[in-house]
Amino acid sequence: PEQAHMASSLVFELSKVETQHVREAIVGHLRHVDAGLAQRVADGLGMEALPPAPPAAVAPIDMPASPALQIIGKMKDTLEGRCVGILINDGSDAATIKALRKAAEAAGARVKIVAPKVGGAKLSDGKKMPADGQLAGTPSVVFDAIAVVLSEEGGKLLSKEAAAVDFVRDAFGHLKAIAADAGAMAVLKAGNVGKDKGVVDASDTKGFIAAAKTRQWDREPKLRTLA
């Protein structure tokens, strides 16, 4: 998955280069790195033929694969120093939110509460929970994992809100873990977020923490065409 991710990243960045001969020059240089990588990037850019490799200043030397150059392989399964966002609304289950927050903080994460109104929301126990951020201005991109805890009515309301749908859809697309209770399912459905091992029931705090410590790399080929 890491090679596909790298090739797709090169395609993404080079697609922003408007000058064709510059794109071709870079792909030509990639041939000195790896012929297969160059071909995948060329295909992703829609090139009909692989550009020629420029003369190498020094003859390329093949070296054995180094774990030190990996990203996924070196990624530590941890929540320490990371941040979990919990989306709530009026009527959200107080006990579920408390359990998720406790589990995330015990794992070393910071927890931020997100609500439609920055003033917070009144939970199922009748108490007002202040928010750290307003939903429209606090997208899931700022979190390492998210939880969505909503009442049935709250889920129906937020399933019609673009910011809420984007909150879960972007987290899913960025391969992040998502915890969701029954009320949140309406929002997930609106965002076309399906179940996988990284989308867990909000009551399963242990499963959520385990999933939140990493990214769901197996999800990526199901979401986008990789180079």
Task: Identify the meaning behind each predicted range.
Residues 174-181:
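ADP-ribose/adenylate-binding Rossmann-like module
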Residues 4-173, 186-227:
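Extended, subdomain-level signal for the structured scaffold at the beginning of enzyme domains
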